[in-house]
Amino acid sequence: MEQQQQQQLPSTTTRPKPKLLNRLNTYVGSSRVGKRFKLAERNSTFTTELRAGTATFLTMAYILAVNASILSDSGGTCSVSDCIPLCSNPAIEPSQCTGPGLRLIQPDVSCKFNPVNPGYAACVEEIRKDLIVATVAASLIGCVIMGLMANLPLALAPGMGTNAYFAYTVVGFHGSGSISYRTALAAVFIEGLIFLFISAIGFRAKLAKLVPKPVRISSSAGIGLFLAFIGLQNNQGIGLVGYSPSTLVTLAACPASSRISLAPVITSANGTVSLLAGGSVSGDIMCIHGRMESPTFWLGIVGFVIIAYCLVKNVKGAMIYGIVFVTAVSWFRNTEVTAFPNTSAGDAAHDYFKKIVDVHVIKHTAGALSFSGINKGHFWEALVTFLYVDILDTTGTLYSMARFAGFVDEKGDFAGQYFAFMSDASAIVIGSLLGTSPVTVFIESSTGIREGGRTGLTAITVAVYFLLAMFFTPLLASIPAWAVGPPLILVGVMMMKSVTEIDWEDMREAIPAFVTMILMPLTYSVAYGLIGGIGSYVVLHLWDWGEEGLVKLGFLKRKVKEEDNNNGVVKASEIDTTV
């Protein structure tokens, strides 16, 4: 017996120790933190949640620069009072504007438009910096609330689409819209409170359940197509898809030197060409040569292949590897794929990038709400629009992300949905107080879910990155679009799996599902896809509902003759129309 024990001792002492990460996962999983976030129950680990949060943040980090850029186009709180007097001779500085024939010209409302007054331009730049920090702060707080209260791997930030509506339709370019920036924030604030109220009483969840099953299922695939479409474009993707005047979209991938912008213009009788009233100049979206010679496109393709190959081989962190590789290559200057071209804008971006650490304090947008325009019709028009878009858009996104993560049960519910709705609504209120447009659950959360994120620790990890972004915004704001495009496309691929749950043999389900999916990318709106899907579902079922109502009222008698072998429903021919 002693010899056997002695023989067994070497085997126990030479047994390899668990790896450091495994020991860390075991320790955290059994700790109060692990139990609080249900790591073991949801078959996840601490390091998996960290990796998922990292992937989610990297795919949505573009919002830091993009949201601030869009909202600052409204002019924010800047006004004519920020414009400075200019000399009648533009070549002379105002301080030296003395002498015969020279005078200081006091600014008027035209100082906000081209050529923009230097004082107003400086104010807008301060607003942009304020909005970067406001975006970070609102996103950070929203992610913390979602992670702690709902325990879901969902990240929040100011939503794309609603920010454009806020800036260009409600407030208008440099304040040329129907209501002021301050009043628009008040509309978002009140809308957030209404949203919070209907979420608190559980009415929002009931509204969500009213969405027909085929629309709920297909919305996940529709959002996937939407993401892929974004990833294929030039502004936020690899640039494979561009504008065509004859077919709307076409194959692009041309270099920046071969792209042009478009603008709605009007030609007068004397041949003068001017911008159409209310029109705006687009980005460089149209290729003038049909050759795929864009270096950034091919670098994006390399990133796509890296991520795709890692996914095929089930390599963890696939999204991160692709983003980091493309971004690192793009940070080298004086190359064909640089994120910092030798232009004034490129020089400014590179100078900002070289700061690495930059802390900015919000000076203008925080608490800038004004309720003075609450009695105007445009105010309530904006409020109602924000509300219905948030109800349809964010609710659809929440359910799609929950379904993608496998949380939704047979009844259409998922764990933590009450607090998820509350977190989302709370973030809208907080965002308005900081000065930004409505905050919502980001569809890029699907990237982290794909990396294995299943608990609120993923959202908390994203919040930590947003906290770091307070100090490292120059680095994170320098992630190029062609680095973000590949993961968006591949997440779209993975989100298409929900279409297998649709009964394509039943046209009453197939048509609404298809309408939902196709409208989301082609109208650039999740909300419009849901509206189209629900509308087509109602139209296709209206006749059956009418007959059912007449049967219940006794005007028609039902005679069951045969049963549909496919779905077991009573056919229209089975109803006796005899009164």
Swiss-Prot record:
Q: Which GO terms describe its molecular function?
A: purine nucleobase transmembrane transporter activity
Please verify whether the record's keywords include Transmembrane helix: yes
GO cellular component entries:
cytosol; membrane
User: What does the UniProt entry report for the null mutant?
Assistant: Resistance to 8-azaadenine and 8-azaguanine but not to other toxic nucleobase analogs. Deficiency in the uptake of adenine and guanine.
For membrane topology, the record states: Multi-pass membrane protein
Has keyword Cytoplasm? no
Q: Which GO terms describe its biological process?
A: adenine transport; guanine transport; purine nucleobase transport
What does the UniProt entry say about where the protein is found? Answer: Membrane
UniProt keyword annotations, A-Z: Membrane, Transmembrane, Transmembrane helix, Transport
Read off the Pfam families from this record: Xan_ur_permease (PF00860)
Could you name the domain of life of the organism this protein comes from?
Eukaryota
Chief site of localization: membrane
Which positions, given as ranges, span the membrane? 52-72, 131-151, 183-203, 221-241, 260-280, 292-312, 320-340, 379-399, 414-434, 459-479, 480-500, 514-534
The protein's role, per its UniProt record: Transports natural purines (adenine and guanine) as well as purine analogs. Confers sensitivity to 8-azaadenine and 8-azaguanine (8-azg).
Similarity field: Belongs to the nucleobase:cation symporter-2 (NCS2) (TC 2.A.40) family. Azg-like subfamily.
This chain belongs to the protein called Adenine/guanine permease AZG1
Query: What gene name is given for the protein in this entry?
Result: AZG1
